[in-house]
Amino acid sequence: MDLAESIRKIDYNSLDISDYSRRYIQALLPILDYYLDICNRALDLLPPSVHTLVDYGGGHGFLSFLAKKRGFEHVIYVDYNPQASATVTALAEQIGFGPDTVLTGDHNTLKTWCDEQHIIPDAVVGIDVIEHIYRLEPFFSDLRSINPRMQMVFSTASTPYNPWIRHRLHRIMHRDEEKFQQMRHDFIATLNLELSPNELDHWVKATRGMTFNDIKSITSIEHITSIPTPPFPNTCNPITGSWTERILPIKTYRHLAAPLCVELHKGFYNSYQRGPKGIASRMLNFLLRLPFTLPLAPFIILKINAK
């Protein structure tokens, strides 16, 4: 039985998982073949020397299951959401196999575990996760400290090249900008800093992209030297630190990942669709084989490795 069939045959309504996980998986099932193709493309970019793999921000864990199915020796699943980790464990019982290690946490958790277990992963793969990570600088720093020659592959729909995708994502980001701005305003107002309305407004603007914990650590306005300048800087959830979507230029990823090398690969459309959408997807996928068609790609894949 192939992996897609094993995943589809599970009775998710009777499975002991969170309602959020259940809804997320059930929404993904209609495009499961397409999603697994994306995971396969990411894994195909890894060299044969990779044996220990990290599925970072693994969510439902489908990448982990696929990696084990493909023969990776040790798959380490990492997600900060305990409900996601519990879901992967429950799915593994149903499918009959799963990741060898399940960690609940972030890159700090992964680094600590690797140090304690004396395990050095060969690669990290993340599907639709890099655009949500709170602080990319320490993220890449921790991965490099675990293994200076770490292979990394990240797919992201937050492509800066496709104007249609950017427009759609900006609409989503604008919706959350206002919500997160009000959340920061209300939180800062509770800190008893005796701020004037203008000072409070400055704080709200200057703390864009920060969590409540980081905001609370600032004890005076002088600590904020400049207002952040990303095009849409309010889309960081101040409670969780997760960004709604973050569209970064490729040069930013290259700067953050240095001295590692960043390669850019084009994504592809869902050719499993029927009718006109399926025909259009197959035509676009054909065009994506041609040079200079990056603005057509619905997502991008970043391959990061040592020079």
Predicted regions and their residues:
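Conserved N-terminal segment of class I S-adenosyl-L-methionine
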Residues: 1-119, 272-281, 296-300
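Conserved acidic residues
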Residues: 51, 122, 150
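Short phosphate-engaging motifs
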Residues: 84, 132-135
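A conserved beta-strand element that flanks and buttresses the S-adenosyl-L-methionine
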Residues: 125
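Hydrophobic adenine-recognition pocket in adenosine-nucleotide-binding enzymes
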Residues: 129
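S-adenosyl-L-methionine-dependent methyltransferase catalytic module, highlighting the catalytic core
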Residues: 134-301
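Active-site beta-strand termini and strand-to-loop segments that position acidic
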Residues: 304-306
